[in-house]
Structures are given as C-alpha cells and as structure tokens.
Swiss-Prot record:
Originating species: Streptococcus agalactiae serotype V (strain ATCC BAA-611 / 2603 V/R)
Family to which this protein belongs: Belongs to the D-alanine--D-alanine ligase family.
UniProt name for this protein: D-alanine--D-alanine ligase
Subcellular compartments: Cytoplasm
Entry keyword Calcium: no
Protein's pathway: Cell wall biogenesis; peptidoglycan biosynthesis
Residues the record lists as binding Mg(2+) 1: 288, 301
Taxonomic lineage of the native organism: Bacteria, Bacillati, Bacillota, Bacilli, Lactobacillales
Length: 348
C-alpha cells in the first residue's frame, strides 16, 4: 500500500511559534509511518518558508526540528513550493498568521486539503471579541466584558470598564492565544498597564470580568457529524494560567475527566458543539469554559488549533475517549480530505 504524504507546517510569525515547534515535534513522533510519508516546512519569524526534514519512518528520539535558532536559509523555498498534488497539509501553527484564516486561505489558493477549520471559522475564532459577538447570538453564556480599539477614547473605555466590571479584570489582545499578552488587573493603575501590554500584540483589546472559577476544557472533532469529549480540568499551581505556566514552568496538571456532575458535563458538551457550529467550524477545536462555585458555566475561548504536544489537553481528552494520538491524526487527515472534496464540489 502506497503511503500518503503529510506536510507539517510549523513555526510561524506569531508569538506562539515556540509552542508550534513543540506541537510539530510531538505530531511527527505520533504519526503512523506505515501509512504516511512526512515532509516538514519551517516558517521563520519573518515569514520565510524553509524546507526541512523528511521522514519515511519514526525519527530518532534525539531528532529535532529546525527553529529560528538553527535555521538554514540555504533551504529557503517559495511558499508555493510546498505544493504536492497528493499531499495533505497539517498546519501545526498557533496564533496570528497560523490559525486566523491566513494560512488556510493560502492553502485553498493552492487547492490543497488541510487539517483544521476553514478560513471563516479560523478568523472568527482567532478574534476574541468577534467570537463573543457571534456566540451571544446562539445563547452561549460568557462573562461580562468591555472593549478598547486603538485610536478610540481610552479614558472612556477605562471609565466604562470601572463602572461595569469589578476587579480582578483580565485584559487580553483580541487576536492572540496561549495566554500571550494577557494580564490581570487589580486596580486602575494595573488596568492601564495591562492595556498598554495588550496593545503591543493587537489593536483590539478585550477587557473582561475576572471570575473565581475552575477551568474546564472540551475537545471537539468532526465536520457535519460533530463529536465532543468528556471535559478535562486544568489544575493550576499558579494564580494565573499564563504562557510560562503552560509551556515553560510546568506549573499545571490536568484532571481527565474533570470531576463535574453529569448535568454540568452534558451542558458543556452541548455548548461546545453549539459554539463550533455557530462559527461554521470543521475538523477540530477545543472549547475552554469557566465553572464557578455556584455552578455557572461561561465559555471563555474557542481554540481552532489547540496545542498538540504530548502533554496538551486536546490529544489527552481524545485519548480518554479511546482515540489514540496516532489515530487522532489519521482521523484529522480523513476529515481534511472530506472537507477538501466538499470545497472542490462547490460551484464558484
């Protein structure tokens, strides 16, 4: 049986590029090499495409993918050179220029099947403010928030936030993930500092009510036939689940499945499915919820390309459902081909 070619795109221009490398290295070790031949392309911090390793069998344990520190510019190619008539692309890219519709649009121009959500749902989910506006239309509960757009009246935004929200308040760039650029404000001074920090990453800022809550996550998989996992819980050893806590300091553990009652579990799974469909998503996503002590559920975020490291919540959630990491990758490839065939069948 001939092997299918799977192209891993990783790295990228966003602040989440290091997470992308970790995810890609985990994926390349989980792939079933009896079924796939793997090509890898590294996207540098400035957007160059670099042709990197190819794997016909499981790489050795010490094999590392190219990074910005080890990049070989002699292997630079034109972005369109990744085209392969019979390949499926797995864009293991997080954040802007990765899961915001940009790379998805590029791959659709090339007419290549790709793992993950489409252009529209990627771009909607990448913007936290737009996501909130869309999900409000289908009745998915969310915490109170205000917004600030660079160039608008900052003093008015701060005044409105102080009048309608109470400390602690979380300030987030609208278009960033992995907790990059997010900070917690406990007074007006730190609120201003938090907005300044967020503006370094985006011109659209979400100012959100902080809640004392457990962080519960649900995995989503499918195209028309959407499946969800039992929830998993992020158990924190830190006050705020930031980028370093997630990926550097290892200050979190996960409880899978989460210890929640059946009614709460079912409600979260239904909200996750409803949110996924509301943004027109396909392939995969992870829905992140807050669960308060009095049982209130709030959807915090919809992540269309969740972390894929061996310790990431998304693959672990599916493993708990009986789907191994390797089988999950095969399922995602199948869903990618299914969506590609549907796109190609549409008249334009």
């Amino acid at each position: 049986m001939s092997k299918e070619t799977l192209i891993l795109l990783y790295g990228g221009r966003s602040a989440e590029r290091e997470v992308s490398v970790l995810s890609a290295e985990s994926v390349m070790r989980a792939i079933n090499y009896d079924k796939f031949f793997v090509k890898t392309y590294f996207i540098t911090q400035v957007g160059q495409f670099i042709k990197t390793q190819e794997f016909d069998e499981m790489p050795s344990s010490d094999e590392k993918l190219m990074t910005n520190q080890t990049v070989d510019l002699d292997k630079m190619v034109r972005p369109s050179d990744i085209y392969d008539d019979n390949a499926i692309v797995f864009p293991v890219l997080h954040g802007p220029m990765g899961e915001d519709g940009s790379i998805q649009g590029f791959l659709e121009v090339l007419r290549m099947p790709y793992v993950g959500t489409n252009i529209l749902s990627s771009s909607v989910a990448m913007d936290k403010i737009t996501t909130k506006q869309v999900l409000a239309t289908v009745g998915v509960p969310q915490v109170a928030y205000q917004t600030y757009f660079e160039g608008d009246d900052l003093e008015h935004a701060i005044k409105l936030s102080l009048e309608t929200l109470s400390f602690p308040i979380f300030v987030k760039p609208a278009n960033m993930g992995s907790s990059v650029g997010i900070s917690k404000a406990t007074d007006e001074s730190s609120l201003r500092s938090a907005i300044d920090l967020a503006l370094k990453y985006d011109s659209r800022i979400l100012i959100e009510q902080g809640v004392t809550a457990r962080e519960i996550e649900v995995g989503i998989l499918g195209n028309n036939d959407v499946k969800t996992t039992f929830p998993g819980e992020v158990v924190k050893d830190v006050d705020f689940y930031d980028y370093d806590a997630k990926y550097i300091d290892n200050k979190i553990t996960m409880d899978i499945p989460a210890k929640v009652d059946e009614a709460t579990m079912e409600a979260m799974r239904q909200y996750a499915s409803k949110a996924f469909k509301a943004i027109g998503a396909c392939g995969l996503s992870r829905c992140d919820f807050f669960l308060t002590k009095d049982g209130q559920i709030f959807l915090n975020e919809l992540n269309t390309m969740p972390g894929f490291t061996q310790w990431s919540m998304y693959p672990l959630l599916w493993e708990n459902m009986g789907l191994t990491y390797s089988d999950l990758i095969e399922k995602l490839v199948m869903l990618a081909k299914e969506m590609f065939e549907k796109r190609e069948s549409h008249l334009i």
